[in-house]
Amino acid sequence: MTQPLRIIFAGTPDFSVPPLKTLIDSEHEVVAVYTQPDRPAGRGRKLTASPVKQTALEHDIPVYQPVSLKTPEAQAELEALQADVMIVVAYGLILPKAVLDMPKYGCLNIHASILPRWRGAAPIQRAIQMGDAETGVTIMQMDVGLDTGDMLTILKTPIKPEDTAQTLHDRLSALGCDAMMTTLSNLQTDQLSPVKQDERQVTYAEKLNKAEAELDWQASAQTLARQVQAFNPWPVAFTQYQGQPLRIWQAEVGHASTQKSPGLVISVSKTGMEVATGKGSLLIKQVQPSGKKAMPAYDFAQARQLTGQTLG
């Protein structure tokens, strides 16, 4: 029988919760959870605990929330936990070399891409946006670089035509649990075979910003449809209508072969509103006007008789 591992878990957002719950339910011992400090959230800007902290507290696991892991105090605290390994999932703090070297087996990271493609902050969204056929999760041995460590386990999944960043996020989070448990099992039985990343294949997934969510109707319908799916649920693709932002939650490549001016609403039907683009048409299915709830594009377009009007 292999000995259960003493594990420190470090993570912050929703993506990190399934791996933490998987570890709690496993034979291993989660000795502590590290997460970002509570942040103001919602309309009242009330201090709110991260999803990972909430999960840890529900299971009576000690929670640490240092602002930095670079101070001697924070490092002494972590070292005192005498962990075998630290699992890091979207934690959001830089781990200095001293911390990376503290646990017996170092620090392992669950990254939501097939490395070395899409190192960085937004691998899920960039994979959809660029039309990748597949993506996955990589478990890597962390080093001081950004997602540069040796790869220990890779699990893949196809990107489906209907995938949004949310659906892919949920699937990869679950896949990350499987990859993590496989890696820990291999670590316990000394069967890990680290693979170096090919630096020639590296691409970077830049952090998302709200400005890039605005649709450029000169682009192709294919590009715009991917943008809508990649930016759902945040920052949400949008266009302008009568000087107000109109969020677009759901869209797909339309069937109209059009030479019409990009941004022109060609037709409105029960399936949605079809808009001319730089190449082909985009069928918009769900929109959200400023200050209102999301609604079928058909309802929005019918009420305003949008056929023949221009968006953007």
UniProtKB/Swiss-Prot annotation:
Chain positions recorded as (6S)-5,6,7,8-tetrahydrofolate binding sites: 113-116
Gene3D superfamilies in the record: Formyl transferase, C-terminal domain (3.10.25.10), Formyl transferase, N-terminal domain (3.40.50.170)
For this protein, the record's InterPro entries field holds: Fmt (IPR005794), Formyl_trans_C (IPR005793), Formyl_trans_C_sf (IPR037022), Formyl_transf_N (IPR002376), Formyl_transf_N_sf (IPR036477), Formyl_transferase-like_C_sf (IPR011034), GART_AS (IPR001555), Met-tRNA-FMT_C (IPR044135)
Q: What EC designation does it have?
A: 2.1.2.9
| The keyword Ribonucleoprotein belongs to this UniProt entry's keyword annotation | no
Q: Which UniProt keywords apply?
A: Protein biosynthesis, Transferase
Judged by the first EC level, this protein's enzyme class is transferase
This protein's GO cellular component annotations are: cytosol
Pfam families per record? Formyl_trans_C, Formyl_trans_N
The record's catalysed reaction(s) read: L-methionyl-tRNA(fMet) + (6R)-10-formyltetrahydrofolate = N-formyl-L-methionyl-tRNA(fMet) + (6S)-5,6,7,8-tetrahydrofolate + H(+)
Locate the transmembrane regions by residue number: none
Give one GO molecular function term. methionyl-tRNA formyltransferase activity
SUPFAM superfamilies assigned to the protein according to its UniProt record, in alphabetical order: FMT C-terminal domain-like, Formyltransferase
**General function of this protein:** Attaches a formyl group to the free amino group of methionyl-tRNA(fMet). The formyl group appears to play a dual role in the initiator identity of N-formylmethionyl-tRNA by promoting its recognition by IF2 and preventing the misappropriation of this tRNA by the elongation apparatus.
- Family under the similarity heading: Belongs to the Fmt family.
Protein's name in the database: Methionyl-tRNA formyltransferase
Give the organism, scientific name.
Hydrogenovibrio crunogenus (strain DSM 25203 / XCL-2)
> Which gene underlies this protein?
fmt
